[in-house]
């Protein structure tokens, strides 16, 4: 909770400074817009979506993947899964998350939840069937690393910030085009709406690059946490196994791609919009840290 409060306070200060700067520059005289009120409006709507998504993330993940939470283990594999997650959670200093299995042939796993002490860790049936116990443990350790690092909360807050700024500056641009260029004095016209939508599309792409950059950084941190909890050799072996299965069709819903362990097939400019680094880069980072 302290992380959320500090993050919100910091970004509130940034928003206030941005509003004051625009006022001092006299931008409001060109557009006749109250930027303080606009900032508040954009912040409310910008954060609302990302925070609501965060708080219902466990429910959404279960529904979209068909994850079955293990409350009472029915097989020795489920018993091993629960014991392994409990052991890793204890070592990471977090409460035991819910543990589930989702029906997918692809080898994948994800962690989600609004709080590191109220999370969900789930693995695919395909991963359990084809990976060795050490490799499964490494994947679980990677997901526990995400939970312990508070990555889900941080990603939601960053998304809220970029949402706010995209909405804010898109509306400034739209109003500037409408008032200062098209000289419309009769309230928001077609120029305002067209310019705002255009700006939101362009700024949205730039914002996605920022969010995905953070997402890729957190994957490296989660890999490092997985190596610490399960061993560097096991973590590298798990990533190598994932690399060998990259031809298997992805069944993870798009909304959960950023939270899965698998991903990162593109390089170059396309790689800027990927939630995961290429597996080769992740493996090399682990090898470099072990030297």
Curated annotation (Swiss-Prot):
Q: Which EC class does it fall in?
A: hydrolase
Its taxonomic path starts at:
Bacteria, Pseudomonadati, Pseudomonadota, Gammaproteobacteria, Pseudomonadales
Q: Which residues bind Zn(2+)?
A: 142, 146, 219
**Co-factor binding details:** Binds 1 zinc ion per subunit.
The UniProt gene name for this protein comes to htpX
What are the UniProt keywords, alphabetically? Cell inner membrane, Cell membrane, Hydrolase, Membrane, Metal-binding, Metalloprotease, Protease, Stress response, Transmembrane, Transmembrane helix, Zinc
Identify the InterPro entries for this entry: HtpX_protease, Pept_M48_protease_HtpX, Peptidase_M48
What this protein needs as a cofactor is: Zn(2+)
**Protein family:** Belongs to the peptidase M48B family.
Q: Which Pfam family is one of this chain's hits?
A: Peptidase_M48
State the membrane topology. Multi-pass membrane protein
GO molecular function terms here? metalloendopeptidase activity; zinc ion binding
Protein name as annotated: Protease HtpX
Q: Organism's domain of life?
A: Bacteria
EC assignment = 3.4.24.-
Localization per Swiss-Prot or TrEMBL: Cell inner membrane
Bilayer-crossing residues are 4-24, 36-56, 150-170, 193-213
Q: Offer one example of a GO biological process linked to this entry.
A: proteolysis
Return the GO cellular component terms, semicolon-separated: plasma membrane
Q: What positions does UniProt annotate as the active site of this protein?
A: 143
């Amino acid at each position: 909770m302290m992380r959320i409060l500090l993050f919100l306070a910091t970004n509130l200060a940034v928003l206030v400074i941005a509003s004051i700067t625009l006022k001092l520059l006299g931008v409001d005289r060109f557009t006749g817009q109250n930027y303080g009120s606009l900032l508040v409006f954009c912040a409310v709507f910008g954060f609302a979506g990302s925070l609501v998504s965060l708080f219902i993330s466990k429910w959404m993940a279960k529904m979209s993947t068909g994850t079955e939470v293990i409350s009472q283990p029915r097989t020795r594999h489920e018993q091993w899964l629960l014991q392994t997650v409990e052991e890793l959670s204890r070592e990471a200093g977090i409460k035991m998350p819910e543990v589930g299995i989702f029906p997918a042939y692809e080898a994948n796993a994800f962690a989600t939840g609004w709080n590191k002490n109220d999370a969900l860790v789930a693995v695919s049936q395909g991963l359990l069937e084809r990976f060795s116990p050490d490799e499964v443990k490494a994947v679980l350790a990677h997901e526990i690393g995400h939970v312990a690092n508070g990555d889900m909360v941080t990603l939601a807050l960053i998304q809220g910030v970029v949402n706010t700024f995209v909405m804010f500056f898109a509306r400034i641009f739209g109003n500037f085009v409408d008032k200062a260029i098209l000289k419309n004095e009769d309230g928001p016209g077609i120029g305002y709406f067209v310019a705002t939508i255009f700006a939101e599309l362009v700024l949205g792409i730039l914002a996605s690059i920022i969010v995905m950059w953070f997402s890729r950084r957190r994957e490296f941190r989660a890999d490092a946490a997985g190596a610490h909890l399960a061993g560097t050799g096991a973590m590298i072996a798990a990533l190598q196994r994932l690399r060998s299965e990259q031809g298997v069709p992805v069944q993870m819903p798009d909304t959960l791609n950023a939270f899965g362990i698998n991903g990162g097939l593109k390089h170059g400019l396309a790689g800027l919009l990927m939630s995961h680094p290429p597996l080769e880069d992740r493996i090399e980072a682990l090898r470099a840290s072990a030297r």
